[in-house]
């Protein structure tokens, strides 16, 4: 055993945050969730902060954490989980493909406090809770529905001095059968959002009578791609948008949000 290289200016602050993800290693530092993969492959490049888009919120919760922080990487689900028991929060990082800035997509799970994790090949992903063993899967919280909420950071479209007049949102959503969602938008850092609901019909399987040997002939199935269009109003220099929905045993994945807007000037 010999020392081949050293990394200065950063350290792991939680032993159980270290996870190998194939060709990469993730760990929690006082600068965020760090990736070693880029440094291992090309030594001239620095460590990569894969939590940069949520770094401030993440490190604030880490600073208040008094209980042991646990983590796990699930190859089948392609996510890295980091649990913060004191704040009743689990950070979930999607490790499939980094964003253009090198960070991972991140979301939080609230209302659960996993005490342990186990990812069993060909059997599923499990979490140990104070109430028992929980298996991850499906689109219900046990037998109950749960809320999904996505909000962007304030958007200035490249120039804060120009007034934006939002006209229409074109969304691309996978799934959402028999679901009602709400589009939220607000101007100039307000938390009092304008809202417009939109919904999807239940997906039906196409059938043509009954097959000869007493079986049903199926011609379509699977998840549906929905492209709702929502008209919007108002104006401001900075825009925040969001989508909320109640997940009720059906997939709901926001793929794209296109914003149609006009610009103007302050007089």
Give the positions of each predicted feature:
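A short beta-strand motif characteristic of beta-propeller blades
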Residues: 2-7
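Beta-sheet repeat architectures centered on beta-propellers
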Residues: 9-15, 19-24, 30-267
